[in-house]
Amino acid sequence: MSQCPFSSNPPAEWHNAELNFSDSMSYGDYLDLGRILSAQHPLSPDHNEMLFIIQHQTSELWMKLMLHELKAAREHVRQGQLPPAFKMLARVSRIFDQLVHAWAVLATMTPSEYKSIRPYLGQSSGFQSFQYREIEFILGNKSAALLRPHAHRPELLQSLEASIATPSMYDEAIALMARSGLSIDPARLALDSTTTTQHDPSVEAAWREVYANPSAYWDLYQLAEKFIDLEDSFRQWRFRHVTTVERIIGFQPGTGGTEGVGYLRKMLDTVLFPELWRVRSSL
């Protein structure tokens, strides 16, 4: 019969485990669990609000890791050090996969349950997530208008303004292709970093050359596939976002003032790496 893990006389196999943490760092200390687990403050009396809060808090934690990986990967691409970037981009793709599955947990909330907590949310909305906005900026989907929801937080606004003015991951990849001898229109290389990524024929032609000769451009070829994998996972996350929101609130407006599902459906048309998708039709 197994012994209770909280017994004062632990089983023999526990004898080498540290059990006294009065003078050393414990698991909870290292992870700062005291603050993390006390950061949930439901405003309504409804049981289901805890799910809503934790769903969004954990998403923000995963996005923090995404930003950590994306910024490092972008710097490696800028320096032409692609192998380290591959691991980081693969990790971001798997984080998106994790977030795709997480929607299934929120989808256990019914319309009636959400209706009970919605009045307590005010105008707070995932649309206002500054981390999500920075992820989009790093990946090339930029719009200065999307800085406005953060104007009331000068420190966040300053960070996002710096992010939108910094070349995107894809900009750095295109610059690397030019340095690798592939022909890129100088106008594309001189493009204002604050603009969103648009299709460029010279970039598509360069990627076509890479895909036609993968052994000659192996690292760029691998980078292209990492980008495709990342955007594929991102698209799945966006789609699952739409279906989860529609399942819970239908076509009601979002709390942040957007069209709700209508707005999210428009976001499904966003393409981060347009030439990489277009080139597949001409190989």
From Swiss-Prot:
Binding site for heme: 241
Pathway per the UniProt entry: Amino-acid degradation; L-tryptophan degradation via kynurenine pathway; L-kynurenine from L-tryptophan: step 1/2
Domain of life of the organism encoding this protein: Bacteria
Gene3D superfamilies in the cross-refs: 1.20.58.480
Function, as annotated: Heme-dependent dioxygenase that catalyzes the oxidative cleavage of the L-tryptophan (L-Trp) pyrrole ring and converts L-tryptophan to N-formyl-L-kynurenine. Catalyzes the oxidative cleavage of the indole moiety.
Cofactor dependency: heme
UniProt keyword annotations, A-Z: Dioxygenase, Heme, Iron, Metal-binding, Oxidoreductase, Tryptophan catabolism
Any GO BP: L-tryptophan catabolic process to kynurenine
Entry annotated with the keyword Glycoprotein: no
Keyword Iron recorded: yes
Molecular functions (GO terms): heme binding; metal ion binding; tryptophan 2,3-dioxygenase activity
Protein family according to the UniProt entry: Belongs to the tryptophan 2,3-dioxygenase family.
Organism, scientific name: Pseudomonas fluorescens (strain ATCC BAA-477 / NRRL B-23932 / Pf-5)
Residues holding substrate: 52-56, 114, 118, 255
EC id: 1.13.11.11
Name of the featured protein: Tryptophan 2,3-dioxygenase
Cofactor binding annotation: Binds 1 heme group per subunit.
Reaction(s) this enzyme catalyzes, per UniProt: L-tryptophan + O2 = N-formyl-L-kynurenine
NCBIfam families registered for this protein in UniProt: trp_2_3_diox (TIGR03036)
Oligomer status and interactors: Homotetramer.
Entry-linked SUPFAM superfamilies: Indolic compounds 2,3-dioxygenase-like
InterPro entries membership: Trp/Indoleamine_2_3_dOase-like (IPR037217), Trp_2-3-dOase_bac (IPR017485), Trp_2_3_dOase (IPR004981)
